Design a protein with these regions (language model features):
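Short, basic/aromatic recognition patches
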Residues: 1-11, 54-58
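A general structural detector for well-ordered alpha-helical segments in enzyme core domains, enriched
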Residues: 91-98, 120-128, 151, 175-182, ...
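A cross-family glycoside hydrolase active-site/sugar-binding cleft signature
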Residues: 9-11, 76-80, 108-110, 136-138, ...
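A short, well-structured catalytic beta-strand-centered motif of the EAL phosphodiesterase domain
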Residues: 7-44
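EAL-family c-di-GMP phosphodiesterase catalytic domain
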Residues: 1-5, 16-20, 30-33, 111-115, ...
């Protein structure tokens, strides 16, 4: 990718009771040659059509995100199992080395949309854990997400996807609460994403979430490379 075509936004990860920043999630941002923004979802959809390119871009992004991370805080970075699966051995080794040298880093394994990809995701979780890295399962509750008991057993962090905030009936709330209890009983942490209002923050506290993220705290973001 050409210089100046991407940057990193470090979105704050907040302890919801004290409303203090305890870490950041590194989010890739992209622009066209004319400077106009490109949604990250659109960019990654295009990259998935060329898995080898996806793997190379992922390595470059992770290098930028880790080398420019805010000091003395925990860093959450996303890793797509497809990019891992299609990485050359040398690139995969470099990526693991970057993550290991990155200090307090949690690797978020992005949920996938079919069973074959879910198996790749499970294997990625196992590889990361074997290297002593902390692992988060991203987007729990997503409509088209999949997860395995093996991945759940190994995860250090469970992240709940934002759309459940807008469709949290009694039954779904009970399921989320059961996940939170399970996480705490096994020593894992929970994160609620998509917190946009004070009411969302109050809900996170009521659900006993450990951490939150979202637009409500956008003014605390750190931007590098724009």
């Amino acid at each position: 990718m050409g210089a100046g075509r991407y940057w990193t936004e470090y979105e704050p990860v907040i302890e919801p009771r004290s409303v203090t920043v305890v870490g950041y999630e590194a989010l890739a941002r992209f622009r066209k040659p004319d400077g106009s923004p490109v949604p990250a979802s659109s960019m990654f959809a295009l990259l998935h059509a060329d898995p080898a390119l996806l793997a190379r871009v992922e390595l470059e992004l992770k290098r930028h995100q880790i080398e420019n991370r805010p000091a003395d805080t925990e860093l959450f970075v996303n890793l797509d199992p497809d990019s891992w699966f299609h990485s050359k051995p040398a690139d995969a080794g470099e990526l693991l080395g970057l993550l290991k040298r990155g200090g307090r880093t949690v690797v978020e394994v992005i949920e996938n949309m079919d069973a074959a990809d879910a198996l790749v995701g499970r294997d990625l979780v196992t590889t990361l854990k074997a290297r002593g890295l902390s692992v988060a399962l991203d987007d729990l509750g997503a409509t088209n997400g999949l997860f395995s008991f093996e991945a759940l057993e190994q995860a250090d962090v469970f992240k709940f996807e934002r759309s459940f905030l807008r469709r949290l009936g009694d039954r779904r709330k009970a399921i989320v609460q059961a996940f939170v209890r399970m996480a705490h009983e096994t020593g894992a942490r929970t994160v609620m994403e998509g917190v946009e209002t004070e009411a969302d923050l109050d809900l996170a506290v009521a659900l006993e979430m450990d951490l939150v993220q979202g637009h409500l705290f956008r003014d605390r973001s750190v931007v590098v490379g724009r």
